[in-house]
Amino acid sequence: EYLWQGGEIWQGQSPLLFPIVGRLREDTYVLSGKNYRLEKHGFARKLPFFPEKMGREEMTLILRDNALTREKYPFPFELRAHYALREDGFLMQFRVKNTGDIRMYFSIGAHPAFRCQMGDRVVMDRTENADAFRLDKDALRGQETEAVFRNSRDIEITKEIFEKDALIFDGIASGGATLMRRNGRHVHVDFGKAPCLG
């Protein structure tokens, strides 16, 4: 079992975060003089996607804007989530299309939750020198950083790492990371050139 199956601590397994990743101050933003409320990680994870293409080993699901989304996010859009089984893994790809005429602001993120145990390790593809931002008391990205990678590639999973919630990195050099289980099994995640990693 590689993915977290949900439980008391966290019900999610692998939500798609859109049109924001993280939280806004007071869950509110202003656009063209109007206030909009948008909850943590946006609304896509809580809405039904509809099949666009279905195959034996892959599928594409689509979410289009509707009256409910426009109350929180006044942009017309199409969000496609493509999933495919591969011989050596599983592929997730997301595409966002602005179907309107005005500039559309958004962020998107994958949030797969892998089952791990204390003592497992996360090993980056490349040697890193990176500090991590932590969440502040309002669950917003704080300004303070802490040293995580110093000419190193790996982090041990400990309770202390999660005391302040997520580690948030900007500008990681690696394009992927591997969760190395103590039992020898592993999961590799390729995140390409994602500008932020949490």
Positions of predicted regions on the chain:
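Short, well-ordered beta-strand segments enriched in hydrophobic/aromatic residues
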Residues: 1, 83, 90-98
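Beta-strand-rich N-terminal accessory domains
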Residues: 1-31, 35-38, 174-195
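Residues that act as N-cap/strand-start positions at coil-to-secondary-structure junctions
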Residues: 23, 43-45, 75-77, 108, ...
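Extended, loop-rich substrate-binding clefts of extracytoplasmic carbohydrate-active enzymes
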Residues: 34-87
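Hydrophobic residues positioned within well-ordered beta-strands of beta-sheet architectures
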Residues: 59-61, 79-81, 92, 108-110, ...
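Beta-strand elements of well-folded, non-transmembrane domains
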Residues: 65-67, 85-87, 98-100, 112-116
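Short, hydrophobic/aromatic beta-strand segments
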Residues: 102-108
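Active-site/ligand-binding surface loops and adjacent short beta/alpha elements
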Residues: 105, 113-194
